[in-house]
């Protein structure tokens, strides 16, 4: 997260994790109207940053955090922690995972018949890594992401259409961020 604090010629094309975490907190408290939440936190800088921002906003707006459980990236077995969360019966599970881990969490939650709503970050915004792996278990999952697929901006719409034509799948946040970075480099070269 501190990489872009290094100087005036270092840029970021996406928001910091704690900012996106606050967006998740807003989504949980205001849009999904959750009163209680369990947090599944990927144990790295990104996951920790998301969790910090989420908890900061959510608790300030009346959401009670029932549990905070960390997991290592690449974890395969989430059933024990999901069983614990099922007993707590939160209104919402906030999941900071990347695509594959997030998909496994959803599949294992479905296997345990957990009906709790799930909120994730841009880490889940991946057609191949998340949606194809999670399958039907991804139905109803809400994510916060900086890719606005409803944008009327012609650059965005052109990107969305051409990406799908080129690769045969819907674009995700990672591809969009890469495209933004490329456009920034092109603009800098022109100037």
Question: What do these predicted ranges mean?
Answer:
Residues 20-23, 48, 70-84, 153-157:
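Structural motif
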Residues 78, 89, 184-191:
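Extracellular/periplasmic bilobal clamshell ligand-binding domains
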Residues 8-14, 83, 143-150, 167-172, ...:
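Second-shell loop/turn segments in exported
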Residues 38-41, 89-99, 105, 116-121, ...:
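Periplasmic-binding protein-like
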Residues 40-49, 97-100, 148-149, 171-177:
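Extracytoplasmic "Venus flytrap"
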Residues 1-7, 13, 71-78, 98-103:
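Beta-alpha junction/loop-to-helix N-cap segments that form part of ligand/metal-binding clefts
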Residues 106-179:
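Extracellular/periplasmic periplasmic-binding protein-like sensory domains
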Residues 1-68, 117-142, 150:
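Extracytoplasmic ligand/sensor domains, especially the bilobed periplasmic-binding protein
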């Amino acid at each position: 997260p501190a990489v872009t604090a290094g100087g005036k010629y270092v840029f970021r094309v996406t928001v910091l994790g704690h900012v996106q975490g606050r967006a998740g907190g807003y989504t949980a408290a205001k849009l999904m109207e959750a009163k209680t939440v369990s947090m599944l936190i990927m144990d790295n800088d990104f996951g920790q940053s998301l969790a910090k921002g989420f908890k900061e906003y959510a608790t300030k707006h009346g959401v009670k955090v029932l549990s905070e459980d960390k997991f290592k990236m690449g974890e395969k077995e989430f059933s024990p922690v999901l069983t614990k969360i099922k007993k707590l019966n939160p209104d919402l599970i906030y999941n900071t995972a990347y695509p594959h881990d997030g998909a496994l969490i959803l599949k294992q939650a479905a296997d345990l018949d957990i009906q709790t709503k799930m909120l994730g970050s841009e880490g889940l915004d991946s057609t191949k890594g998340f949606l194809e792996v999670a399958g039907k278990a991804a139905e109803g999952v809400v994510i916060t992401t900086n890719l606005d697929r409803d944008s009327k901006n012609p650059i965005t719409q052109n990107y969305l259409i051409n990406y799908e034509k080129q690769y045969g799948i819907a674009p995700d946040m990672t591809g969009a961020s890469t495209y933004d970075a490329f456009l920034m480099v092109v603009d800098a070269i022109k100037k």
